[in-house]
């Protein structure tokens, strides 16, 4: 579904991603891991067209993403939940959700009822401003907004950051449910090991912009954690 091939990226004069290769199969749940500042968010931004790629390729469902504008990538079926959520605090919950409808390739211009099935709190707070929601509720709104697209691939950048434990568990349940019931492919950046081990089927570790370990989540051993993830 998603193939990243020998990807290199620079930020100013700094070489931030070095010959990164990553294949994400349809229906998989890939967790991108690494210490802070190792290139995880940069890689997601390259996939979404928010950072330029110096060399290498990114293919999604047979499409060369390096030749697609950022909004075009969403229309191809990629939902994106950025770090920090980036909801519109002055807009209502409903207005935030409707923003996603504008880039849907096909289908009705109405919020899918599935969103409220997954996140009942959003239905109760439709007319509340996004800025009035708690951090956990805002994260649910950000995920809901991405799912309005009915994507094939959902990308989440640290979805548990700053979220209360009960909401973290709910988000994990929803990711697993969407994957099992709808075959949704998931790529997430995550720092919390218990969450990663619960939700992911596969992992990839970046260290100083290089891929240093990858495989089934059961291969995420204590040795790998000590070498590349421990602070």
Go through each PLM region and give its residues.
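Conserved catalytic motifs of ABC-family nucleotide-binding domains
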Residues: 150
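Helix-to-loop junction immediately C-terminal to a conserved catalytic motif
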Residues: 48
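The feature captures the beta-strand-to-loop junction immediately N-terminal to the Walker
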Residues: 33-35
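Conserved ABC transporter NBD signature motif
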Residues: 56-63, 76, 108-110, 215
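ABC ATPase C-loop
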Residues: 146-147
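Helical segment within the ABC ATPase nucleotide-binding domain
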Residues: 169-183
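Conserved ABC ATPase signature
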Residues: 129-133
């Amino acid at each position: 579904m998603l193939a990243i091939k020998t990807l290199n990226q620079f930020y100013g004069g700094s070489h931030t991603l070095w010959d990164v290769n990553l294949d994400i199969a349809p229906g998989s749940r890939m967790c991108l891991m690494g210490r802070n500042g190792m290139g995880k968010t940069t890689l997601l931004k390259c996939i979404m067209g928010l950072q330029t790629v110096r060399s290498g390729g990114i293919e999604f469902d047979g499409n060369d993403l390096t030749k697609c504008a950022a909004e075009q990538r969403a229309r191809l079926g990629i939902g994106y939940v950025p770090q920090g959520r980036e909801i519109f605090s002055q807009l209502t919950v409903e207005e935030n959700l409707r923003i996603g409808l504008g880039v849907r390739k096909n289908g009705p211009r109405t919020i899918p009822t599935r969103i409220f099935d997954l996140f009942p709190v959003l239905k109760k707070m439709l007319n509340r401003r996004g800025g009035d929601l708690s951090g956990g509720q805002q994260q649910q709104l950000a995920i809901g907004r991405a799912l309005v697209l009915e994507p094939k691939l959902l990308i989440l950048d640290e979805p548990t950051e700053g979220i209360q434990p009960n909401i973290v568990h709910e988000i994990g349940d929803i990711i697993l449910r969407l994957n099992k019931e709808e075959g949704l492919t998931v790529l997430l950046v995550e720092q919390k090991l218990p969450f990663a081990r619960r939700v992911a089927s596969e992992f990839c570790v970046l260290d100083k912009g290089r891929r240093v370990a990858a495989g089934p989540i059961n291969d995420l051993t204590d040795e790998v954690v000590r070498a590349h993830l421990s602070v």
